[in-house]
């Protein structure tokens, strides 16, 4: 399976769609329709989506070739298009390229799966800030010193409320119990007839083996695995 095929399987996931919506909102291109994908730096629209417009536009003290829903700079788009074999600047291809940029930037904190675990958390925003200037770093400022959106705004767009702590981040035994722990506790309780007793060495070995059998293997994200592959030699 190619990287492009893997990305096509990921781009429709709710967590990815929410993150892409956040970026469009932050970059000022979210217009609720196909025009979002035609926006050039400064707000004017590209005539079509046959290719990246590659026009240097000056406005507000800045000059940029940024274009599309995710404001791809011309060199950035060319790099993504080459890597994924994209032949035009269509909305579908822009989503694929943006998902690849998301994946690359999030690799340092766990890959795309971190979006499903944490939502648009402060460290997710900070990891993406070097790619999109409108996203805040952990200090709340733009990585490039440009105007930036508030994290609370972005979290609302993502579909979550800012919370000081997530139950998913609590340690087992502090406000929650893992499914494996709950199952194992019930199993051992039933085996012992709910009566505490001193366990023999054999019993302890059996419990350890049972705990290992019931502990699920860690999930491996194929996109993250592919991104970490290096050529041999």
Label each PLM-derived region with a short phrase.
Residues 1-87, 96-193, 199, 205, ...:
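Cell-wall polysaccharide-cleaving catalytic domain and substrate-binding groove, primarily
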């Amino acid at each position: 399976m190619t990287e492009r095929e893997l990305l096509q399987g990921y781009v429709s996931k709710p967590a990815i769609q929410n993150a892409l919506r956040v970026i469009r909102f932050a970059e000022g291109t979210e217009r609720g329709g196909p025009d979002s994908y035609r926006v050039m730096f400064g707000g004017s629209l590209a005539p079509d989506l046959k290719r990246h417009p590659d026009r240097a536009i000056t406005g507000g003290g800045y000059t940029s070739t940024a274009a599309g829903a995710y404001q791809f700079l011309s060199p950035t788009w060319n790099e993504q298009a080459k890597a994924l074999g994209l032949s035009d600047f269509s909305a579908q291809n822009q989503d694929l390229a943006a998902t690849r940029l998301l994946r690359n930037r999030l690799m340092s904190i766990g890959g795309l799966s971190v979006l499903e675990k944490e939502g648009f958390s402060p460290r997710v925003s900070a990891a993406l800030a070097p790619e999109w200037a409108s996203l805040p770093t952990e200090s709340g400022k733009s990585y490039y010193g440009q105007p930036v959106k508030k994290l609370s705004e972005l979290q609302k767009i993502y579909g979550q409320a800012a919370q000081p702590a997530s139950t998913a981040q609590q340690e087992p035994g502090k406000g929650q119990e893992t499914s494996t722990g709950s199952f194992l506790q019930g199993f051992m309780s039933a085996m012992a007839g709910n009566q505490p007793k001193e366990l023999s060495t054999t019993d302890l070995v059996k419990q350890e083996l049972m705990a290992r059998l019931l502990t699920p293997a860690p999930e491996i994200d194929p996109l993250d695995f592919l991104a970490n592959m290096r050529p041999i030699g």
